[in-house]
Design a protein with these regions (language model features):
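A structural supersecondary motif
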Residues: 83, 292-296, 319-361, 414
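M16/insulysin-pitrilysin zinc metalloprotease superfamily fold
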Residues: 103-109, 139-170, 321-322, 346-404, ...
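An aromatic/glycine/proline-enriched structural segment found at the starts
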Residues: 22-32, 37, 199, 234-301, ...
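M16/MPP (pitrilysin/insulinase) zinc-metallopeptidase core fold and M16-derived inactive scaffolds
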Residues: 74-139, 182, 202-206, 321-337, ...
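Scaffold signal of the M16-like zinc-metallopeptidase fold and its non-catalytic homologs
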Residues: 21-35, 148, 180-230, 250-253, ...
Length: 503
């Protein structure tokens, strides 16, 4: 057990809160029937995001949420940096840069020495790079905050990008590539992103060995120097801090690190690929076919649009609420075709989002499960949902809403993300009212407007001979979709992503 875990355990064991949690309820206070349980009325006030917002002299926005329950502090830096800034020849550069900032040491400390100092402080530091964002984080016990921040800013500002650690990262990446075709879900996700966004879009590009071989230490240094800059950063801090004190510490950390004034093409560009609806298949000898059905939905930038609340209620009813959703009830509970089935209406601020139905089923029942799922999509467009179904969905969403602000960390990170995507903090003040105002007519209206069951991409990974025939009772086959036409996609070389011969 490392020092951080040991100290945390000691704090928990001696905490009055922990002791209270261990107290056993008296038997006479426990009702003998579930329906006799009495709950206090939910009284929750949404925090005011502006009260947590601060700005450093160099322009960096910081959100601070104090919580003195335990002597722990968390800090996260979110950056408007990601793989959308890579060239097509250097796919993976943003991710490698993000990873090596933490693992590759600093100019003054070799990786092992840096790791030892972090461990000695019982701290945890991290960094990463993704599609439209990068991040760096620190966790520390309160007595070690200043020393941890010193290491954190050394890492953030002066990464070494150690050559040996870079080779380790590359070796790990190649090993991960070699396993790409072992997992049907990985194949499904890869082909799905290409079908919806195209091969050349940053969000769907996949790193190859050639890409990896073409990235060197100087590329990482250049990417960091150009984009990991204060003007691209938003900071959130939570835990056992005094706001004025932590702001002063951050100001010192950012001292002498001015913004470059260079643009990083924010927001990221949208895709130009034209989606072609139809049935697509990748052959793989597995007992259960993996299935995704769906289409793109509009990019979401108008956060005041009440359609968002109606769509969340609609998706909750259709397939987003687990065992209570329509798709799950029919596909699993009624027909026993899958362990899990559902839908997801995904909102994205930087590119078109997706509406997706997903499940896995025996190869011979894939067609029937797909047919039933699309029937439920159409039913949501054609019929008004029932009053009870509507109220349960709205109640579930509203009752779970306070969990978004359960902790100081969630408060700070939620409001920081608002700033990241350009969403007003007032959005949260209006959200519950908007959900509560959703009617059955609203659910049907947004289903008709945003769902396109006749224009879906239906992607399958599995044994085509079994999938095509359909279920033994003849209730559905792949002839039910797009006139029986199918495009067979090749299995790809895991290192080059070129089609494998004969596959």
């Amino acid at each position: 057990m490392n020092r951080f875990a040991t100290l945390l355990l000691a704090l928990l064991v001696t905490s009055p809160l922990y002791a209270q949690a261990l107290q056993v309820a008296k038997p006479d206070t426990i009702p003998d029937r579930p329906e006799k349980l009495v709950f206090s009325e939910l009284d929750f006030t949404v925090p005011d995001g502006d009260t947590y917002r601060h700005q450093l002299p160099n322009g960096v926005v910081v959100y601070v949420a104090e919580d003195h329950t335990l002597p722990l502090v968390s800090l996260n830096v979110m950056l408007k940096v990601g793989s959308y800034l890579e060239s097509a020849e250097q796919v993976g550069l943003a991710g490698l840069t993000g990873s090596l900032i933490r693992s590759g040491g600093t100019e003054s400390l070799a990786p092992r020495d840096f790791d030892e100092q972090v461990e000695f402080l019982a701290s945890s530091l991290s960094s990463s790079g993704e599609g439209t964002s990068a991040s760096a984080g620190a966790r520390s016990i309160t007595p070690a905050v200043e020393e941890s921040l010193a290491l954190f800013f050394d890492m953030l500002r002066h990464p070494r990008f150690d050559l040996e650690r870079l080779e380790v990262e590359k070796s790990n990446a190649i090993e991960a590539m070699r396993q790409r075709n072992d997992d049907a879900d990985a194949i499904l996700g890869r082909e799905w992103s290409w079908l919806l966004y195209g091969h050349d879009y940053y969000a769907s590009r996949r790193m190859t060995k050639n890409n990896l071989d073409g990235i060197n230490r100087e590329d990482l240094r250049a990417f960091h120097a150009k984009y990991w800059r204060p003007e691209n950063m938003i900071v959130s801090v939570s835990g056992d801090v005094e706001t004025d004190a932590i702001l002063a510490s951050l100001e010192r950390g950012f001292a002498d690190w001015p913004g470059s004034g260079a643009s990083n093409r924010w927001p990221p560009p949208g895709p130009t690929h034209v989606v072609v609806p139809g049935v697509y298949h990748v052959e793989k000898d597995i007992p259960q076919g993996k299935v995704l059905i769906g289409h793109l939905v509009p990019q979401w930038t108008d956060w005041s649009n009440p359609d968002r609340a109606a769509l969340q209620v609609m998706d909750h009813i259709l397939g987003g609420s687990g065992f209570t959703s329509r798709i799950m009830k029919r596909v699993r509970s009624d027909e026993g075709l899958a362990y899990s089935a559902g839908s997801d209406f995904s909102f994205d601020s930087f590119q078109p989002g997706t509406f997706t139905v997903s499940f896995q089923s025996k190869n011979e029942t894939v067609a029937l499960a797909a047919k039933i799922s699309l029937e439920e999509v159409r039913r949501t467009q054609e019929e008004l949902v029932g009053d009870e179904e509507l109220e349960v969905a709205k109640g579930s969403l509203i009752q779970s809403f306070p969990r978004r602000f359960d902790s100081a960390g969630q408060i700070a990170s939620t409001f920081a993300y608002d700033t990241f995507i350009g969403r007003s903090h007032d959005y949260w003040q209006r959200w519950r009212e908007q959900v509560g105002d959703v009617t059955a007519d609203d659910v049907r209206r947004v289903a008709q407007r945003y769902l396109k069951p006749d224009e879906v991409v239906l992607l399958l990974v599995g044994k085509w001979d079994e999938i095509a025939k359909g279920d033994p009772e003849g209730r559905a086959s792949m002839n039910n979709f797009f006139g029986g036409k199918v495009i067979h996609l090749p299995l790809r070389d895991p290192l080059t992503l070129e089609p494998l011969a004969g596959k």
